């Protein structure tokens, strides 16, 4: 949650989307080559950020069922002028590749083609400009997720409706309609304002959680106050309701990847990117991470969610049932998570593209 909160401060009026599990798995790869205080910082950060982080990055898709796909693209690119330790290369296996950074354009195309392949063509260009010829090592991270809704929205019900970017700015969106679905829902009143949480299941064992503030501009208060602990507490308050859901189709495509170096430094990982970086388990030379790039893509429509980021059967009596109507027509937060609570993606949607 902390990386996401740092990003939304830097991008207050933009759509933001990251994949925490992808970022953490990449940090785990780096940790294989870290020593001393660098290893201590990395180990502590990974432990504090996500207790469910897999020990091996290749296990990221263990809990993803046949009806969904999760493909991660995490890679360390190291200079071919450096002799890396065999023990390090054995640990990370396919997650490492040597390149000639002096041939900047070729290296750029190599990285972009790899990311395109790993994300099923949804992310075509992680790098929009060549890396510096002085680069010694670069970490890139991308992820692709696709899952079918457990309760698909009917395409013939989709209509054009208003979306309030702010109280004074209104645009239009394609609004999807899901009726009479039994979903996990709660409305919560906190000191900073009221909001609704709705858990929308996919086929299998993952779901999208929407946090929708009551106030059109209430997203800013949620951003300031949400924590991992509060999110878990709020989700524990969910209960089954009959819901009429009005949700916009939306797509988020990043034009530039996030460089997470300054954000991770702000969060305490100071001994990875600077003078005190110790990657002596990686190689004998002094080396530091110069870039940590992360990019994502998401497409939410009537049939499925696709990101280049379960529930049981509920029964009701045949009687008059009060249905809660949820209109997602202004900025909101969303998470895609699995049944363990592991957040695969977290984002903010505030500006239809």
UniProtKB/Swiss-Prot annotation:
The positions annotated as site (Reactive bond) read 318-319
Give the protein's biological function. Answer: Plays a role in mediating viral host range. May act to inhibit a caspase independent form of apoptosis to allow efficient virus replication in infected cells.
Where is this protein found? Answer: Host cytoplasm
| Chief place of localization | host cell
**Family per UniProt?**
Belongs to the serpin family. Poxviruses subfamily.
Which Pfam families does its entry note? Serpin
SMART domains assigned to the protein according to its UniProt record, in alphabetical order: SERPIN (SM00093)
- Which InterPro entries does the entry mention? Serpin_CS (IPR023795), Serpin_dom (IPR023796), Serpin_fam (IPR000215), Serpin_sf (IPR036186), Serpin_sf_1 (IPR042178), Serpin_sf_2 (IPR042185)
Question: What protein does this entry describe?
Answer: Serine proteinase inhibitor 1
Q: Which UniProt keywords apply?
A: Early protein, Host cytoplasm, Protease inhibitor, Serine protease inhibitor
Molecular-function GO term, any one: serine-type endopeptidase inhibitor activity
